[in-house]
């Protein structure tokens, strides 16, 4: 394996710096990819550029990448369907009726209730982080707009309740991946090991708790405070010059004529998508369950299969199932005809082209950093030689944060850090569960803060907000949770 040293840090850091500084995220990511391949090709501009083009093409060699990008595009069709059907208008009317009751008792409580409902929804859909952020965005964006709550706030709530709940309630693909990594380190019962470490996974716990505190407190900080002030005083849901992750054609679709708004036209397709997620996870992991747990009960095999299933396949089939169901459901109600459905599907997909492009660039820069420049491995190797037992969890957390921030992938960070953290903790006699939790929490923290994270990108898309504005407004809250988690790891590490 070729070692690039500190040069491996430049592509992700420069790409992220320019993305935040210039708000030109597409150009910044493309430049980061090009710089990475320039380093690999010894700064030969011709071969570096050709390798960059090939790297973008190679994104689609990975079936998981392709399925994820297809999922993002098809989400546009689902969004436009539920708006055209009157489902969004019906949901707004239904929630408004509930809020009216509370508004009569205490003025202003409706804003709090809607935000708490959004947080709770994201928390409960722990089976898959992508489905979680999509559901929260699709359900609550219209209500946030109506109540004058910024889309940046919605993106923050969706993002901060998705990955943290998915990793803390690990009966999903997250848990399966973590158990696979732990099993590779020689743990005889990786499930029990994972559960014991969850009590020490402080970042996702704190990140989840900060959200309701911020909502109930009613005060925001940093860029989020400015965003909320903008909406309140100027009535602008987006900042001037903002570039929402989805086209206005999707968020401003008018309801079909002569249609009565019905909340179930929105709720049922969303529930179909959420329901199909664990079903498809179990289906794609069933063969492995029969192989690994042949004597277990059907229920135990089902739970194990969910953990072994393909997340990208599950989300793609889930959204396809929801779209196909919606077509039949709306046709039976005479809301729209087949020709209009096809036109709306194509219109919805076209509205997601910016998101699909951004996902492609994010996958490409993640690949060049992880698999070619080995950025994460370099960062981990820099600190592992001078660790003391008490500092192991603290520094493992910080390194995990940096790797995830630089590569935009929490799972990739887990794959790098667990094989390093476990032997290190065993060799230095550090708390093994605390160290595992630190590696996992660092991955989630960096993933939250990074503009090249797929979860952050999907949160921006689902909330129809500018991606860089989402990253900027979420960062102070993530830093608070991350700082608190780091301090706890340091104190516990030094006391044990």
Language model feature labels by segment:
Residues 1-77, 90, 94, 98, ...:
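Hydrophobic transmembrane alpha-helices of multi-pass solute/ion transporters
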Residues 9-29, 115-118, 152-160, 164-167, ...:
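Alpha-helical transmembrane segments and their helix-start/interface "positive-inside/aromatic belt" motifs
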Residues 10-21, 31-39, 71-80, 118-125, ...:
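Hydrophobic core segments of alpha-helical transmembrane domains in multi-pass membrane transport
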Residues 46-155, 335-428:
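Membrane-embedded alpha-helical segments and adjacent helix-loop junctions characteristic
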Residues 91-94, 131-143, 172-186, 412-423, ...:
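Re-entrant/interfacial helical elements at transmembrane boundaries that shape
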Residues 107-125, 149-174, 188-206, 227-230, ...:
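Alpha-helical transmembrane segments of multi-pass membrane proteins
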Residues 143-237, 253-265, 456-488, 493-496:
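Membrane-core helix-loop-helix motifs of multi-pass transport proteins
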Residues 193, 207-308, 320-343, 462, ...:
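Long, contiguous bundles of hydrophobic transmembrane helices that form the permeation core
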């Amino acid at each position: 394996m070729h070692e690039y040293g500190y040069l491996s840090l430049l592509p992700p850091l420069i790409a992220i710096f320019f993305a935040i500084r210039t708000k030109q995220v597409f150009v910044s990511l493309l430049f980061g990819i090009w710089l990475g391949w320039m380093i690999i090709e010894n700064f030969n501009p011709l071969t570096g550029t050709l390798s960059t083009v090939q790297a973008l093409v190679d994104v689609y060699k990975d079936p998981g990448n392709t399925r994820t990008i297809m999922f993002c595009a098809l989400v546009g069709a689902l969004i436009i369907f539920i708006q055209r059907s009157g489902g969004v208008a019906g949901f707004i009317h239904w929630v408004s009726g509930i809020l009216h009751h509370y508004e009569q008792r205490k003025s202003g409580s409706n804003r709090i209730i809607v935000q708490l409902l959004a947080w709770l929804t994201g928390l409960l859909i722990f089976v898959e982080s992508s489905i979680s952020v999509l559901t929260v965005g699709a359900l609550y964006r219209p209500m946030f707009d109506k109540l004058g709550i910024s889309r940046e706030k919605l993106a923050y709530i969706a993002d901060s309740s998705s990955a943290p709940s998915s990793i803390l309630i690990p009966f999903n693909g997250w848990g399966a991946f973590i158990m696979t990594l732990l099993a590779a380190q020689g743990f005889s019962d990786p499930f029990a090991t994972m559960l014991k470490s969850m009590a020490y996974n402080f970042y996702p716990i704190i990140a989840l708790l900060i959200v309701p505190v911020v909502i109930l407190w009613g005060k925001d900080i940093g860029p989020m405070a400015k965003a909320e002030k903008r909406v309140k005083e100027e009535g602008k849901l987006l900042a001037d010059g903002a570039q929402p992750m989805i086209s206005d054609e999707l968020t401003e679709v008018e309801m079909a004529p002569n249609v009565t708004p019905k909340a179930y036209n929105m709720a049922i397709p969303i529930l179909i998508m959420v329901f199909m997620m664990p079903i498809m996870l179990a289906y794609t992991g069933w063969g492995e369950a029969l192989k690994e747990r042949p004597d277990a009960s059907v229920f135990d095999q089902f739970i194990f299969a969910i953990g072994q299933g393909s997340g990208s396949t599950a989300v793609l089939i889930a959204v396809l199932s929801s779209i196909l169901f919606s077509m039949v459901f709306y046709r039976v109600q005479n809301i729209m005809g087949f020709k209009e459905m096809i036109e709306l599907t194509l219109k919805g997909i076209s509205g997601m082209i910016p998101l699909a492009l951004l996902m492609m660039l994010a996958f490409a820069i993640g690949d060049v950093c992880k698999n070619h420049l080995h950025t994460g491995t370099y960062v981990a190797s820099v600190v592992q030689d001078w660790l003391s037992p008490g500092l192991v969890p603290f520094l493992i957390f910080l390194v995990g944060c940096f790797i995830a921030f630089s590569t935009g992938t929490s799972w990739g960070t887990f794959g790098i850090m667990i094989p390093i953290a476990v032997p290190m903790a065993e060799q230095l006699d550090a708390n093994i569960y605390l160290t595992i939790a630190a590696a996992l929490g660092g991955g989630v923290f960096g993933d939250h803060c990074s503009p090249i994270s797929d979860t952050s990108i999907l949160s921006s898309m689902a909330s129809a907000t500018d991606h860089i504005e989402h990253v900027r407004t979420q960062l102070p809250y993530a830093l608070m949770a991350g700082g608190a988690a780091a301090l706890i790891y340091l104190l516990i590490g030094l006391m044990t």
